[in-house]
């Protein structure tokens, strides 16, 4: 550097650049000294040559500029530092100069010690500093900033215009001061004292300093003045709005020093959201505010500004202390570097920088705030998530260390973190990408290595001390090696020798580091396992402490009730720690095994093959054989034995419902099935009385049995016999010829009377049930219609074979039959739900040259509907149209009823509207009743009541079936609870019989409301009428207790009593079912033994055919059977008394006698169904009611534990089970991880498919867990099921996943698919409407009409409106005058005016009287 060049830039050594020359303050004048600078020129020249290209950026190193995440020798991902030089190379100089001038002027005013001339000089010098040329102005703050990672250059830090020296500079500076400034010794001494203090602080700062800590000089700490500048705010906001145009946007940012831009932005963001710091740092320590350097510093500095100039030194000291404390406490956490992802351009094993591997239980969060603020609000407040990342990288971990992978989405994909629903909990470790630190840096300084050694990692376990000591030893070895390298450089070796020597050392160190890293990995794995175990122990202890419940609450647990179950020996159970295990004991019926096992296996196979055929198929074959083959033994019909029970004359009730159509045009029967749920088990063996449920009720029932007159009649009002009395009065009025007005009023209400057609129809059929074919044949008064009724009654009362034999007898005796005979025979297909047999009978009708009528097709359609073949039913409907067979309201009613039974409720309503609008069908009582049943399934109580009012307005008779269906519909709605009892009173007032279906719906109404008082009254009414309680009723009784616990007014003791009552019902069910099954097994076993004996007899008879020995053989067999039967009974009793005796091994097989009763027992056991256990009475619906009971009692863990016991009762959870648990976990527990786990269990382990409601709830929970993997999984599930999110959910997904391209693409594809589906549906609906209109038009053309042709109804309507218009016109005219008598309009106006002659004639002038003339 020559002299001219030096003195041309001598202006740089003004008061602003006091970093590199010494000055003394005396009487407001400054004496500069440049001797120190000249002496140390060579050292600065080397630094200028070496670092001249490093202004305002991190050092550009090929290998050191890369950060690799690797496992062993495999590089998982590489990151590169931000190149600030490229970003700020073309900065706006004018704005930078203007801003620097402003900053310098502010600093000068704060000191109050600089003259105006010096200010101008400083401005000139500062303008030159803005240039990027390689000159002496390089010796500025930028050269010695913290971004220069070097050990040879020590930076000088200035805090509030106070000088701090390095260790090597102090001695030289003191000597220079003594030589040059000898006059002011007193000031020098004071100044040296300050230097000593400042040097001590500076040394401590350098030792404790972090490598990535940004320079904190006076200009950066005075940025609060520039924070208020709106230009800077705009530039900061625009900086983080985009990613791709960052280089151009950086031109707008104005800074004093280019490399401090990140520091300024962070300070500005901290200043901007200081009010939110308390909210985000609520989980940290209370004293954490002390760690925040900037806000507290600014506050104190602003307070100190108001003081006098004499207190400036005190303020400066306070600021220094404040800054020193902040540095000391935040040295390990204040990380301000930024990384971006690059390709793997360095695949060598000798890499310079490594990341420590992360924990296995790592979790990823996708939102800026974990449940603390709404997502949409944060998205509106922040335009980009980059601001959140900046905050998150500060000292304070404001967002619980979340990974914002929405912006850094490639990180989690590269590392491959597994997202499992089990790990989605709040207590799991969550890491922040911005806080990832390097393991060990080869090119790091001594200060960094010491800091790494002193850095403490917060382990919970003491065993992790091994890891710390190993780390310290490794770093010491590295220090020794690097120290040798530095000493070699000091000795004066050349650069090439130094490079060769350093390369060899690096290779040696890398080899050592690889070995040490392998050892550290093994140690880390062991320590992680120990930590996981200890964490589990600590968590279990914490959970136990938190979940301490009272003794009363523990007694309510389901495991305590299940331990008390007393079950039949064959199904004995043992419960261990709440988990149910079934251990089946040995059956007493199996006494011993046979010696000859081969013979036994052969016989077992034969009987198994015969038993594989279902009973329904056997019946079909029998009936088909009887129908197609005319047996010769038809005379022996009387001797045919039927297994089915005989008809009870008085108390028998049909499951099916027959309604007679009373029109004269046709006589037929329309069969409507009772509206029952699919899960109801209406078996006679499971029907039982309610015993032991309520002790008080049992006592009252005994009281009722003693006195018939004091029966409790249930919920009945005093007006129950109103209609009966009214009918009696009407008959009396008719006899006595009372007033016709009274009779008319009575007839209105009598027509309103509800008919009981079901019982009347059953009474008619019961007359023929006990009659015989020959009795009717002997009586000459019976015709073919009576034969038809006989066949129909036999079929409807479960005697199908007898009905078919009677049909063959009709053919045998040439009795003339008609199509109705075949129709009566075809009712067998409806009873047995056999569509195949119905088609065979239809073919036989055509073969016998009979023409099928509409009743035939109605029965065919009904048979196919009951066989769950709705498509074939509609094919038959179209066949009727093609063959021009009349389709009346009965066919339409049957088709709509079939759609409802196949759960096509929407299609049923559409078909009803079609026949009413386009076919001009007028609904009757039956069709309205069917539509009310459809409303019951859809829970549309309002529409049901509308149908009821329509029936009343059309004077249709409302039968008992209609009332029962109305009660069924209203019982499913809680808000119509009292309306249910209104119709129940109407039912009772008409003296209709109380049946089981009605009581079921009344119990359902009580269960939905949770009204136990009304439930007791219903149960008493059932006991009075001797109606048995079914399993479905027990389910709703338990549900009544569950819904009763919803009320907040219910106390804890009442809730516990409800749980006890519910389990008491289950005890009664299990005991009753086990007792009844014992009897059933004994009966079935006796029947099976008798059959087996008969077969054995036939075998012996075939072997010994001789007629002479027949009697002897029969006697011999009977004797042997009696003997063996007695032996079997004795051995059974003996074994039951002594089950552990050796008599179990006794053989009961006799070689001379081939009949083995043990074999009979063994074969009988093989034919038993697996479901015939004592748990048959407990179904899924009862267990669902128990889960609901625990949920409403707020015992959520017990509700989840109930899933374990489904397998114990041999049940499978259904849709309602999972729906209740999903709602509980999401809305009440808010445990979104368990929601995802339960959904995974439902999909993989059950056959339940999610619907729209469940999938939307699962999607919300996946978003709440802040996992993109789970969110994408649920969205794909919705896409496959063609269930689409709502517009609100789409908007939420857009904001949440705006940086995940897969989510955006999937949402777009779902929107496109949804539009396609909706378009196709609308197109089909429009085509169907167009088709219906065309069909209606064609039907009009057949009649010779068009749309414009008027029907009689249209003509009558037109006449009515014409007459109405004429009447309105006549009202406008004057009374008794025609339109021709009207006055002209002008005369009319004059007559209305007041005044004038016309008015005087009318009003004013009195006229003379007649007698005056």
UniProtKB/Swiss-Prot annotation:
Domain of life: Eukaryota
Location of the region described as Disordered in the Swiss-Prot/TrEMBL record: 282-315
Keyword set includes Repeat: yes
Keyword Iron appears in the UniProt entry: no
Usage in biotechnology: Possible candidate for an effective malaria vaccine as determined by epitope response in sera.
Gene3D superfamilies per the UniProt record, alphabetical: Tetratricopeptide repeat domain
Ranges of Basic and acidic residues composition bias in the record: 299-308
Swiss-Prot/TrEMBL keywords: Merozoite, Repeat
Segments traversing the membrane: none
Molecular function terms from GO: mRNA binding
One Pfam family hit: PPR_2
PPR repeats: 783-817, 818-852, 853-887, 888-923, 924-958, 995-1029, 1179-1213, 1214-1245, 1251-1285
Alphabetized InterPro entries for the sequence: Pentatricopeptide_rpt, TPR-like_helical_dom_sf
A cellular component term, taken from the record's GO annotations: cytoplasm
Coiled coil: none
Cysteines paired by S-S bonds: none
NCBIfam families cross-referenced by the UniProt entry: PPR
Family affiliation: Belongs to the PPR family.
Record-given protein name: Pentatricopeptide repeat-containing protein 2
Native source organism of the sequence: Plasmodium falciparum (isolate 3D7)
Source taxonomy: Eukaryota, Sar, Alveolata, Apicomplexa, Aconoidasida
Gene: PPR2
